[in-house]
Amino acid sequence: MKYLIKHITAYKYASRVSHCYNLAQMIPRTTQRQTCINSKIEVTPELAMEQRREDYFGNQVFQFEIQRPHKALTITATSQVETRPQIADTNLDLGSTCAEVLSKMQQSKSEDVLLAREYQLDSSMIAAAPEFRDYAADLFTADRSLLSACFALTARIYEEFSYSPLATTIATPLSEVMQNKKGVCQDFAHLQIACLRSLGFAAKYVSGYLETLPPPGQEK
């Protein structure tokens, strides 16, 4: 399947801005399941400097600077992406058990495991804590498949938390989300990662695009 993705980010300032410096990560990655065939980023007003690079995690970073006064900024990223079918087994009980994964994370010296251990560590918005471990611990029994346990945790968060766009900001701590049981997708992703890391598993945040299909007869 081929997709043409157009992502527009626009800022309108209350007063004139004399200078701005930005990093944009708006280009889909090429992975085993998808290929970014081509992409471009257009910015208005005119740029004084631009540079592209790949960061530590493999993301494409577009760095730019504007040195003229402006009251609005528009960044338009256009990408053509081809995806490949995913062959997935719907039996969630298959795969390694929670105990097997934890043992491998602790004992294996393989390159993949050593790289994965980085995602056991705390990050700026996600810190392991007893409250997150206790919230999920009963789901991750030793002999249960890790995949099944992760799906169960996703279902628990979906059932027990309310989607509320005004309840949080990008700086709201997870402890507050946990207490109020409200937030948005970013908060719930952070919560699930915190639960997994608090139990000793490796987990990381991935963002992207989801294709949505409207009800019959309605526009997309």
Question: Where do the language-model regions lie?
Answer:
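Linear, non-domain "peripheral" regions
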Residues: 1-134
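Hydrophobic/aromatic-rich core segments of domains that either
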Residues: 20, 155, 161, 187-220
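Flexible domain-boundary/linker segments
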Residues: 26, 94, 170-174, 202, ...
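Short, surface-exposed, charged/polar-biased interaction segments
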Residues: 30, 34, 45-47, 62, ...
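Alpha-helix boundary/capping detector
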Residues: 35, 50, 179-183, 211
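Short glycine- and Lys/Arg-enriched binding-loop motifs that mark or flank ligand-binding interfaces
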Residues: 54, 179, 204
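Secondary-structure boundary elements
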Residues: 100-104, 109-183, 191, 198-199
